[in-house]
């Protein structure tokens, strides 16, 4: 609902786990998705006014996929801090003492092939709240976003 133009989505890959091949010492084989183009809605209202997307290190999984699509659509700027760099889709492994480990099972890319899993996505405008901001209930990220959208 944010664009009236088609755009390409990110690509991803995941190891093809063939136990016999692993036992034989073969290299990891990969299943790779292709990119595909998303067509805009033709029967719904499209919001075409300016947009600012807020993100930080707590942005991961499908929220990070949304950041990729948002940047690919060229609909606005990302304000905040670098994202977490994890596409989600985790394999859950139970650990002793009721612990759990989550292991990322796929590697995601921008449509142009740039990686963000393990690295994160850099914001266009980096703003991080300080401890003082938090104690004073001040939100410099939101303030920067408002300033950006009004320009």
Q: What do the predicted segments below correspond to?
A:
Residues 62-66, 75, 138-145:
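Stable alpha-helical elements in mature extracytoplasmic
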Residues 45, 57-61, 132-140:
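Soluble non-cytosolic domains of exported or imported proteins
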Residues 50-55, 77-80, 102:
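Structural recognition of the beta-strand scaffold that forms the well-ordered cores
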Residues 60, 73-86:
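Short, well-structured beta-strand/strand-turn elements
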Residues 51, 70, 113, 145:
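Terminal peptide-recognition signature
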Residues 8, 48-50, 74-77, 151:
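Loop/turn elements at helix/coil->beta-strand transitions in domains of secreted/extracellular proteins
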Residues 1-50, 88-94, 105-109, 116:
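Gly/Ser/Thr-rich loop/hinge elements
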Residues 123-151:
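Low-complexity, Gly/Ser/Thr/Pro-rich intrinsically disordered linker/tail segments
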């Amino acid at each position: 609902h944010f664009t009236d133009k088609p755009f390409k989505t990110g690509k991803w890959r995941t190891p093809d786990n063939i136990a016999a091949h692993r036992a034989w010492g073969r290299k990891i084989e990969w299943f790779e998705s292709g990119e595909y183009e998303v067509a805009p809605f033709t029967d719904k209202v499209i919001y075409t006014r300016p947009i600012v997307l807020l993100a930080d290190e707590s942005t991961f999984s499908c929220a990070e996929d949304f950041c990729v699509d948002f940047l690919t659509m060229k609909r606005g700027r990302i304000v905040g801090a670098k994202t977490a760099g994890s596409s989600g889709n985790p394999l859950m492994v139970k650990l002793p003492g009721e612990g759990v480990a989550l292991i990322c099972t796929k590697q995601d890319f921008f449509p142009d092939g740039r990686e963000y899993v393990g690295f994160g996505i850099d914001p266009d405008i980096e703003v991080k709240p300080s401890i003082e901001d938090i104690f004073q209930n001040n939100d410099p990220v939101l303030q920067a976003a408002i300033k950006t959208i009004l320009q």
